[in-house]
């Protein structure tokens, strides 16, 4: 029948949108009507269907006068099923095993094998963790660690691998602690460790320190919204402040659902928990071998830390010997260019000897950043404007910083990390006159973060070595140069604007009282800000307490005169912050490679307590309040007007959404028959109702999620919203049939996977030119072909590692910390970072094990739309951006793995370039190259210099191909 185009389009719209149908029994609309048995429709083409799914798909296609696409090639199918079920491409041997099996059962056997593969759980747990808003930190200010959240991630992986019935999976996460029967008058039955870990689901929302009723209201509201959207596919959270704008969910129903969680409480914070995020509950390791694994891991961590400490001690001794021989510095003016007009001197440093240098600064402005000084008391500094001296002290207490004469001067603080305080400020050459003292009345010190000069030079070297060092060519004016030799000092020279730096400014006039001088010495500690002025010749001396840290202070002198500055060898004072040397400019005496090695060892030691804490048998779970006489009874739940915690309305009792039940009567809650635990069983009642086969939503929602994750789009396009905004299902009867299949097969998710991937619908090709179908159904709602889609971010990273041969396939365990890009790694290195960068195999496990820090998403994964969830995420965005190309071609991660991929090919294919290219295609794309592809990549490899990098370049091209990044 040839229908006019407009009529044909209208017919398609009527078929595809499948407007919401009514249930004749009680006039409730889909999806609130019960799931009932559905008859599989007859097939217009009996040869095409492989199972019931295909009958429903073919019925809609036939009505729209469309036909399904041909089956995909075996090479496409084997790659598709591997990436779909385990998130990794097949090896050439695995692909060949399937391609060479011509039996009718080859596909079904492969599907069963992959569903039994432990990598299946690692792949599919990622989708559930997005729903559960999983993260390893709590978010908000400080983003505190949730040290035991990783156990929930392993619980999900293990549950999926064991094909735990989905109804049990629901009950454990909502009320795992309430399903033990109360058999007598004894103690309350304890929940098992697996159930305690499972209830981490309720705890995973971003959480700040509790603020009484407000925090509790927000916590319970978030739990209510998440449970409703994840398990029921309802946006109940939209009714928190007012009746739902689109669905029949009144505000009253939101708080009736919230009442099921009214007895939830968070464990008390652990001792020393400055963030007050709440503690953990005991939960022994329960999986086979997990207890032994934890003990072995503790021993490994301790052994690694002990080895790192011994190596650090050896390195420090070696560096002290290198650094401690000589010390000195040079000064050079900023003019039209660098010339040899610096003044330089040096002296032997012996057990803390001090080095002093002087330079003329007539008409120039200099900025001195003084660092690595504990303190040194020098005695009088009076004397000429030029000269040098040194002292030998074992335990310096404070330091003299500066002399100027014949002009005005200003002193600027260049940093604010001074842990102690200024103890004294002196005018040292002569007793202060009354006039001089009148100019020193205001003494305050304003703390500021260091802001280095915007132009100038920073020298950490003997200046005479600068010209001889080929790594420090003469820069243009206004640029900075830094270097190290075996002579340690520190100075920044700059023509700076004083406004660019935190200030200890010259202040004239009257000022607030409170600090005074008695003779030569300051009486009392300085307040927050220190400013002073003198117009007379003499030595300005600032005396620090011994708590001065390595960050340093800067002092600036402008105008006519001279300035004297003193430095002390940083190692001679025996400072505990010797490690801070690595935070300075690159060293030539201590190479960059040595610095990196030292930093890695220091991190091993620093992160040990963090990892050991994670290995305690605990879970980031919730608990129920025990009620009288131990704790308060069941709180009264009230509607909160406009969602405001302090604006109570009517009292409500726990109950299910009236749009589903048809009434708003309270739920039946099976209370303790001995009346000792009045707070118990509320969440159990909710979990039992959600997990019941009679619930019209639960099975439909999870069946739709699996369909969405297999095809890229659900039968209901909005997986967590089955309400009116979803526009209903495209194949209503099919979704009901899938839901019925799930419940009849003991809620087995693997049985539903098996049903979907064994269908002819799933096995269609994605590359099918059908202009008529493309015009009629451009979004492929009727599934006349398979949907081509890009791999998720985690699958991209895992596939790159798998193809290079470097993927660590160890299952379960602590979070991992892969290397970050250099700019981000430098930024987090000197903060209170939680990122313990792992450069070895432990950092190359699958992406599901990566530490999920809410304030630090891995840039490579973020580029491919990965998220660290603050809320439940039912689906990922799939963007196409230039950044993805750059990440796959220029990132250090892909570059390294391309080199290893090329080496893997060389090892297996020999030295022949043609054979190497052919094998690279088999490994990356599961097929042989076409003649044109073979020719192009061989030409690229041959033209690349050096010659050994040719195959590396070819492998990088394969990583960047759409075929590698997409599932066909």
What are these regions (language model features)?
Residues 45-79, 84, 89-119, 134-187, ...:
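Primarily short, surface-exposed interaction patches in extracytoplasmic proteins
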Residues 172, 320, 324-327, 445, ...:
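Extracellular carbohydrate-recognition regions
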Residues 178-179, 183-299, 861, 873:
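Sequence context surrounding c-type heme c attachment/ligation sites in exported
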Residues 182-195, 321, 328-339, 351-353, ...:
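Extracellular glycan-recognition modules
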Residues 248-252, 304-314, 421-459, 468-470, ...:
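Extended recognition patches within non-cytosolic domains
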Residues 335-338, 344, 390-423, 429-432:
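Extracellular glycan-interaction patches encoded by glycine-rich segments
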Residues 359-362, 463-466, 543-549:
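Solvent-exposed strand-to-loop "edge" motifs in beta-rich extracellular domains
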Residues 370-398:
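Short, solvent-exposed beta-strand-to-loop segments that form ligand-recognition rims
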């Amino acid at each position: 029948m040839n229908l006019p185009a407009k009529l044909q389009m209208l017919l398609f719209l009527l078929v595809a949108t499948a407007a919401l149908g009514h249930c004749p029994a009680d006039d409730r609309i889909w999806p609130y009507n019960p799931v009932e048995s559905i008859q599989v429709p007859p097939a217009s083409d009996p040869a095409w269907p492989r199972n019931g799914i295909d009958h429903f798909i073919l019925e809609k296609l036939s009505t729209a006068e469309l036909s399904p696409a041909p089956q995909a090639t075996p090479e496409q199918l084997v790659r598709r099923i591997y990436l779909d079920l385990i998130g990794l491409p097949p090896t050439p041997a695995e692909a060949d095993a399937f391609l060479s099996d011509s039996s009718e059962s080859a596909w079904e056997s492969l599907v069963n094998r992959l569903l039994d593969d432990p990598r299946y759980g690692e792949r599919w747990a990622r989708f559930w963790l997005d729903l559960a808003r999983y993260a390893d930190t709590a978010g908000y200010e400080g983003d505190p660690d949730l040290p035991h959240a990783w156990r929930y991630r392993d619980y999900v992986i293990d549950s999926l691998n064991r094909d735990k019935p989905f109804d049990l999976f629901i009950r454990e996460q909502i009320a795992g602690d309430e399903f033990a029967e109360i058999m007598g008058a004894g103690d309350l039955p304890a929940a098992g460790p697996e159930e305690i870990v499972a209830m981490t689901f309720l705890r995973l929302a971003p959480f700040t320190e509790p603020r009484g009723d407000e925090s509790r209201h927000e916590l319970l509201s978030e739990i209510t919204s998440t449970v409703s959207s994840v398990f029921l596919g309802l946006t109940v959270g939209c009714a928190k402040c007012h009746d739902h704008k689109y669905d029949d969910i009144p505000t009253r129903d939101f708080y009736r659902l919230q009442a099921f969680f009214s007895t939830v409480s968070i464990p008390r914070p652990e001792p020393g928990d400055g963030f007050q995020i709440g503690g953990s509950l005991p939960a022994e390791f329960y999986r086979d071998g997990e207890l032994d694994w934890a003990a072995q891991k503790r021993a490994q961590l301790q052994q690694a830390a002990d080895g790192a400490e011994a190596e650090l001690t050896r390195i420090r001794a070696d560096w002290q010997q290198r650094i401690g021989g000589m010390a000195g510095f040079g000064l050079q003016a900023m003019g039209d260019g660098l010339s040899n007009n610096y003044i330089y001197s040096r002296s032997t440093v012996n057990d803390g000897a001090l080095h002093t240098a002087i330079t003329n600064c007539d008409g120039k402005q200099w900025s001195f950043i003084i660092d690595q000084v504990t303190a040194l008391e020098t005695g009088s500094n009076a004397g000429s404007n030029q000269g040098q001296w040194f002292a030998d002290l074992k335990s310096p207490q404070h330091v003299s910083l500066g002399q100027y004469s014949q002009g005005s001067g200003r002193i600027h603080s260049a940093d604010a990390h001074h842990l102690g305080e200024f103890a004294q400020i002196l005018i040292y050459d002569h007793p202060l006159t009354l006039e001089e003292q009148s100019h020193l009345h205001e003494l305050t010190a304003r703390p500021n973060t260091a802001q280095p000069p915007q132009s100038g030079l920073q020298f950490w070297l003997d200046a005479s070595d600068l010209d001889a060092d080929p790594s420090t060519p003469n820069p243009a004016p206004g640029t900075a140069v830094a270097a190290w030799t075996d002579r340690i000092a520190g100075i920044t020279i700059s023509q700076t604007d004083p406004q660019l730096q935190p200030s200890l400014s010259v202040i004239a006039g009257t000022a607030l009282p409170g600090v005074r001088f008695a003779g030569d010495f300051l009486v009392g500690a300085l307040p927050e800000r220190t400013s002073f002025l003198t117009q007379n010749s003499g030595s300005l001396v600032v005396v620090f307490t011994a708590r001065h840290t390595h960050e340093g202070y800067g002092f600036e002198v402008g105008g006519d005169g001279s300035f004297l500055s003193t430095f002390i060898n940083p190692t001679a004072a025996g400072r505990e912050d010797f490690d801070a040397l690595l935070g300075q400019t690159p060293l030539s005496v201590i190479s960059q490679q040595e610095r990196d090695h030292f930093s890695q060892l220091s991190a091993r030691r620093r992160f040990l307590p963090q990892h050991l804490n994670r290995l305690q048998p605990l879970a980031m779970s919730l608990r129920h309040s025990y009620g009288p006489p131990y704790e308060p009874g069941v709180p009264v739940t009230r509607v909160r007007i406009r969602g405001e915690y302090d604006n109570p309305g009517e009292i409500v009792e726990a109950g299910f959404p009236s749009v589903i039940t048809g009434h708003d009567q309270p739920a039946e809650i099976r209370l303790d028959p001995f009346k000792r635990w009045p707070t118990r069983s509320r969440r159990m009642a909710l979990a039992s109702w959600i997990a019941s086969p009679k619930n019209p939503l639960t099975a439909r929602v999870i069946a739709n999620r699996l369909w969405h994750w297999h095809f890229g789009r659900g039968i209901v396009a909005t997986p967590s919203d089955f309400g009116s905004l979803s526009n209903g299902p495209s194949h209503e009867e099919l979704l009901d049939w899938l839901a019925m299949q799930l419940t009849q097969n003991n809620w087995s998710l693997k049985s539903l996977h098996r049903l979907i991937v064994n269908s002819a619908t799933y096995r269609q090709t994605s590359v099918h030119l059908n202009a008529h179908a493309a015009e009629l159904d451009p979004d492929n709602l009727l599934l006349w072909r398979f949907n081509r889609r890009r791999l998720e971010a985690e699958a991209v990273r895992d596939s790159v590692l798998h193809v290079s041969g470097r993927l660590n396939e160890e299952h379960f365990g602590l979070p991992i910390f892969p290397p970050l890009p250099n700019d981000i790694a430098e930024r987090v290195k000197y903060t209170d970072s939680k990122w313990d960068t792992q450069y070895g195999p432990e950092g190359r496990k699958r992406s599901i094990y990566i530490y999920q820090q809410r304030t630090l998403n891995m840039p490579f994964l973020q580029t491919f739309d990965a998220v660290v969830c603050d809320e439940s995420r039912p689906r990922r965005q799939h963007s196409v951006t230039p950044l993805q190309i750059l990440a796959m071609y220029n990132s250090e991660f892909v570059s390294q793995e391309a080199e290893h991929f090329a080496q893997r090919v060389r090892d297996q294919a020999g030295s022949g370039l043609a054979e190497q290219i052919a094998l690279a295609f088999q490994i990356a794309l599961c097929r042989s190259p076409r003649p044109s592809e073979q020719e192009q990549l061989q030409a690229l490899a041959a033209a690349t210099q050096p010659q050994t990098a040719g195959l590396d370049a070819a492998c990088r091209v394969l990583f960047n191909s759409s075929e590698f990044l997409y599932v066909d």
